[in-house]
Structure formats: C-alpha cells, structure tokens
Design a protein with these regions (language model features):
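Short S/T/G/P-rich N-terminal loop/turn motif that feeds into the first structured element of a domain
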Residues: 1-53, 60-70, 93-103
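C-terminal structural segments of small proteins and small subunits
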Residues: 75-91
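Generic beta-strand structural signal
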Residues: 53-55, 87-88
C-alpha cells in the first residue's frame, strides 16, 4: 500500500503567533501516524517561487494523510496558523511502481 504525504510550503508572517500552531499540530500528527521527512533546512529553488519553510510529512497511507488534515484536531491547529502565515499544502499518494533502472 502506498504511503501518503503532505508537501507544505509556508512563509511565516508572525513568528510569535505561529507558535500556537506548532504547539497544537502534533496532536493530529501523532493520532494519524505522521513522520517528518523534511522539516525546514537549507534548500534551493531552481524553478518557481520559493517559500521560507518547506515540510514533507509521511503518513501510513493516503487516507490517513487526508483524514489528518480534515480532523478536528488539525483544523483547530490550522486556525492558529492561517492568521500568521501564507502557504500551500498538497496531499498526495506515494508511488509504489517501478523505478528507473529496475528491470
């Protein structure tokens, strides 16, 4: 079964206010088995417009990734992010098919 992922790109406009989101999002992430694969760090954006923070979060499956976003726990955390940031989140199913160089 393919995993699910959140790909998030965010510009924080109020770091102090954003702390409310950080304090709350872990409740939903733990409930739905989330695991950070990328959480900030140095990056280069060779194409398109960059955001200052980039995150990739892995979930056990696509349905869990969707359920986490739609959960009351995450929606409560999100209410603390939206006034203090601008960004995008894409929720996507992983790929389990053949890879380059495989027979």
């Amino acid at each position: 079964m393919a995993k699910g992922y959140w790909i998030g790109r965010v510009d924080v406009t109020d770091g102090e206010g954003y702390k409310g989101y950080i304090a709350r999002n872990g409740i939903a992430f733990a409930k739905y088995g989330a695991r950070f694969l990328v959480r900030g760090g140095p990056f280069e954006a060779p194409e398109g417009t960059a955001r200052s923070r980039n995150v990739v979060i892995e979930f056990p499956d696509y349905e869990s990734a969707l359920a986490c976003y739609r959960s009351p726990e995450y929606q409560e955390a999100l209410a603390h992010r939206l006034p203090h940031s601008q960004g995008e989140i894409v929720i996507i199913e992983g790929y389990d098919g053949p890879q380059p160089g495989e027979g």
